[in-house]
């Protein structure tokens, strides 16, 4: 058994007082391992900043892609959002020969994100200058790229949050989940700031380099995040043939559940619609360049982080 090195009592007291989410750590889940696990949310946040903070404006303004196609492409990642319940259930009951449940799904999502981001810039450039007779092929490629990224984000997030709940003690789970979503906001802030710097002098070649660099960072961050996070089980799980449908019927039997799901779905759709037009509005009406419109997503995420901090302080006073 390896000896564990723990900081002295005075350092632990300072960490609990000044380090964000230090109280989410536990002896079984140290702070270093917890922050390392949260890196998958950092990669998801960076990818979201690229999709809704930069590419929507670049496609409409610089590449002259029709706005309806941009709206459809950016909305495609949300297609897989309703499937997160099924993804979570399948990871709960995954009959892995390696004794792992969450890691295979997180790695599958990482590969989908990488593949979608790798082909995305070429599909976008093809949309901007389509050859006669090949437009439908380019549109299928662009839709496939956005679908892969969206599916990868949903699968990675669902399995990752389930893994965080698995490794965290019951009394620490609310703080661990809050840390995961805070790390996603950090990813949005960092990604938007990096995009505003890298695309200050926009060119199609620079766009290809930035998007593919984002694909590489997704793989690296998720690889570090997943490393030795899930303990292997010696026996394989067993999946019931109609287990998910049975669980879904039980969920729908709850009072007002359908109304709740419709409210969440419509609210999410309304919130996503403004993301599509906000950056193009800044470009065409306010005359902002790619760097400044990308920075607007950074400021939005900073305000969201401030809102979470204020809510936490108010709840702690009660």
Descriptions of predicted regions:
Residues 77-84, 113, 174-199:
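Glycine-rich segments within core transmembrane alpha-helices of 12-TM secondary carriers
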Residues 215-234:
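C-terminal membrane-cytosol helix-exit motif in multi-pass small-molecule transporters
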Residues 93, 125-126, 188-207:
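Transmembrane alpha-helix termini and helix-breaking/packing motifs in multi-pass membrane transporters
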Residues 3-30, 232-262, 285:
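Juxtamembrane intracellular "pre-TM" segments in multi-pass secondary transporters
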Residues 70-94, 114-115, 301:
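Central cavity-lining transmembrane alpha-helices of secondary-active solute carriers
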Residues 22-60, 147, 253-274:
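Pair of pore-lining "gating" transmembrane helices in MFS-fold secondary transporters
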Residues 53-69, 276-293:
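Short amphipathic helix-loop junctions that connect adjacent transmembrane helices
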